[in-house]
Amino acid sequence: PRPQGNRLTILTNAGGPGVLATDALIRQGGELAKLAPETIAALDEFLPPHWSHQNPVDILGDADPDRYVKAVEIVAKDPNSDGLLVILTPQAMTDPTKIAEKLKAFFESAQPLLKNKTLLASWMGGEEVEAGELLLNQAGIFTFPFPDGAAQVFNYMGHYSYNLKGLYETPTLPMDEVENRSLATSVIDSVRRSGRT
């Protein structure tokens, strides 16, 4: 779905790509979602002590599939976020395909929970992560080769949603509308009585 606002949560296994996404997001008017205290506390329960403790949520380079899925499940529930960008960089302990398989299963089973959240992924690494990208695409998750591009797309989607909302909004009538209508009616009646057209 399109984002309902401009607040994005970024989850990554590497700090640098999270910063790239953050810079692109903020440069175009988006903002990092401020994670709720409950979200931070839930992440603290299972992430290593040296995780980022803020958005972007850096779950560290040794993140296995279970850590990824549990972290995604927690941040996806955060009420302060309009979207989620999951970033993966291949590292020695990373299995991009297995992580994508588990995320695909989670996304497919959690649709009611995620119905108002925009989900994007950046699976960095080219051919090495291709199989994982395909799995995420099959689950309806758009994937991008670079995190800054994903953040830009989130912003574009947010602007589009905002503009659509404006198009369908019924404008309010000014309070002096009744007086103007009366004046217009009297002018038209006067013109008709005088025989002018």
Model-derived regions, located:
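Peripheral docking tails and interdomain loops at the edges
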Residues: 1-12, 16, 22-32, 101-197
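Short, small-residue-enriched loops and turns at beta-alpha junctions
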Residues: 91-95, 126-127
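Short Asp/Glu-rich motifs
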Residues: 44-45, 95, 131, 155
